[in-house]
């Protein structure tokens, strides 16, 4: 299970990156105005945008963007600045400037997956979940016409009304959704083939227990005893 947490490195010999770590807006601005590369990287491939976003320094993120920082830059593990975010305002800034909320790193993890692993606060998790839902629906891509958006909203409203009239259905859908999310995270963390192997082992154990209890091998027909 691999993920990045940038608080493990608070020192660098690159002045601009150190200013981003320290949250020193004025020094960052002077360095950029003097010609420092806004996309300079540390030993892990992280830019100043990665480091500032990870610490919630949205003002420095905006400053770097103004001086030409690449919002799509990834570190050596494929993480964008959004993968390292743990603050609402930095997430909103990056997404509003075109960064995809469902982008995956080299391990296939989205910003939401990494945020959950790091244990960031619930407001951030809820925001990332909401943005992912909107991305799936297409609202963040700008591909829907006003008519399509209205139709989608009406459909969701009708479904919500139906759920309110049927509380048992609403509760059941909530449990199913929670189970589905937990199962997806379990498969992502463990890996598909390991999950498949685990299921196979459990099946063998079940057959062994059944044989131990009943003395009869499952799926094997009992042969009639010969009477001499």
Swiss-Prot record:
Family matches, as Gene3D superfamilies: Ankyrin repeat-containing domain
Transmembrane segments: 195-215
Record GO cellular component, one term: membrane
InterPro entries registered for this protein in UniProt: Ankyrin_rpt, Ankyrin_rpt-contain_sf
Coiled coil (UniProt feature): none
Highest taxon above the source species: Eukaryota
Disulfide bonds, paired cysteine numbers: none
ANK repeat locations: 11-40, 44-73, 77-103, 107-138
Membrane topology: Single-pass membrane protein
Presence of the UniProt keyword Iron-sulfur in the record: no
The entry's keywords: ANK repeat, Membrane, Repeat, Transmembrane, Transmembrane helix
Compartmental location: Membrane
Name this polypeptide is given: Ankyrin repeat domain-containing protein 46
């Amino acid at each position: 299970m691999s993920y990045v947490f940038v608080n493990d490195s608070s020192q660098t010999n690159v002045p601009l990156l150190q200013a981003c770590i320290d949250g020193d807006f004025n020094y960052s601005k002077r360095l950029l105005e003097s010609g420092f590369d806004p996309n300079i990287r540390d030993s892990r491939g992280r830019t100043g945008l990665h480091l500032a976003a990870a610490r919630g320094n949205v003002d420095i993120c905006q400053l770097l963007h103004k001086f030409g920082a690449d919002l799509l830059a990834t570190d050596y593990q494929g993480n964008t600045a959004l993968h390292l975010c743990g603050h609402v305002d930095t997430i909103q800034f990056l997404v509003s400037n075109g960064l995809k909320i469902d982008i995956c790193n080299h391990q296939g993890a989205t910003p939401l997956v990494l945020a959950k692993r790091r244990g960031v606060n619930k407001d951030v998790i809820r925001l990332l979940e909401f943005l992912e839902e909107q991305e799936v629906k297409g609202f963040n891509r700008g591909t829907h016409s006003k008519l399509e958006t209205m139709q989608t909203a009406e459909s969701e409203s009708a479904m919500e009304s139906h759920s309110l009239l049927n509380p048992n259905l609403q509760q059941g859908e909530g449990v199913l959704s929670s189970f589905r999310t937990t199962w997806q995270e379990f498969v992502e963390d463990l890996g598909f083939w390991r999950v498949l192997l685990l299921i196979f082992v459990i099946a063998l154990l079940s057959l062994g227990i059944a044989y131990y209890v009943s003395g009869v091998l499952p799926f094997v027909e009992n042969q009639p005893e010969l009477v001499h």
